[in-house]
Amino acid sequence: METNCPNILYLSGITIEECLQSKKTATDTLNTNGDEAEVEKKLPSVFTSVSKWVTHSSFKCWTCHLYFKTVPKFVPTYMRENERGEIEMGVLGNFCSFSCAASYVDLHYTEPKKWEARELLNMLYRFFTSQWISYIKPAISYTLRKEYGGKLSEEAFVSELHTLEESISSKDIFI
């Protein structure tokens, strides 16, 4: 004989309302370029200008594995002039900084593609900052964080990344 026992799961500190709230999926991103926030399923596959680029991402950075509030950066896969006469770049990845994007290139590309990707990344830096540069220092490894057995707290790690990013504009200027 079967009994109709209810399936009950008790989660201390969690309310039913919290369980029933609709949440964005992990593949959603937030684009706040317009008057109202609009949810996109992924980052755009093509970049044409900073003014048309998304301002936020709900994804983690592909290199440091952290959520971030800065404008998402990417590794350009190509650059060309489109049919409207605009510069167009192919988009790969979601990065919190140019340093994290540079680390991705250094880890996943081999010569001569690495050199080409780094040059395109330098060009992307120019689009974002109006500065010509010759080199972007790669980010430090996420494994330096305590949660991966390293010595840096998340705050100290983020501080190191900010220092690297700020050093790009004050050093390594192309003359």
Curated annotation (Swiss-Prot):
Q: Which Pfam families match?
A: zf-FCS
The name of this protein is Uncharacterized protein B175L
What family does this belong to? Belongs to the asfivirus B175L family.
The induction comment states: Expressed in the late phase of the viral replicative cycle.
Q: Which InterPro entries match?
A: Znf_MYM
Q: Which keywords appear in this protein's UniProt record, sorted alphabetically? A: Late protein
Q: Which organism is it from?
A: African swine fever virus (isolate Tick/Malawi/Lil 20-1/1983)
- Single GO term (MF): zinc ion binding
